[in-house]
Amino acid sequence: MNPEILHRKGAIKIENIPTEVLKLLNLGYIETVNLTEWLAIDHSVLLGSVFPEMGVSEEIILQITSSLKQQKKASAMNSIRNVSSVLYREYMSSSDYEILFQKLKSHVSDSIRCYATYFLALNENISLKDKFIQLEPLIADTHFGVREVAWMALRKDINDNLDFSIKFLTNWTESENENIRRFCTESTRPRGVWCSHIDELKEKPELALSILEKLKSDSSKYVQDSVGNWLNDASKTRPDFVTQLCERWEKESQTKNTQYIVRKALRTILKG
């Protein structure tokens, strides 16, 4: 493999992705390096290349590819959910479930690791606490796509178990890993992106104060952006809460980090 491929910046448009790069991506030999490449993955080709090596039967592979063809909207996220759902359905009662999960979560392809998040999150026999623990390596993944899919995969469970989730994630705000800390706010955003809303937090954002307070002056811009976006979400239904909190933070935490978060948090309110 050409070493330059591993250090590429990535094309801006899908049609500009080099043929060799796209081939290697679809074979599962390399990771995507940007959103353009991530969206360009042909999941039918990818699973056809990788799954036989994992011991997934030809019958199950055909079921998945058939399901992908029947999608009304063949987006990357829908494809990931689709592949994971069929895999889970076929393996949920199998003694090979855990073995396959480990293979998925440790694969070099970021798209394959994305499958692992839903493959585990869909398992109703695993407690939410154990889901958090088992998915922690993917929540902390070095790849942006895996991290995003991880919180989306757990979003419903978090919404259904909000009190527990907030208590658990409050502890994670102490993590040395910025990706873990960012997950605490990104996964609980009242509105979020590409996901269902958490109505209880839209109406009662104060429920998540234990998380927000811990991160109000976080050193990571990645975390700061998420905290600011969380509060901007909340400002659309509870501007009073966000305004009062930001006023207090400006007095209590006179740091550049907090000032940056406050500016992001108030952007909708200040637009009037």
PLM-predicted stretches and their roles:
Residues 1-272:
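Surface-facing alpha-helical segments and adjacent helix-coil boundary elements at the starts of domains
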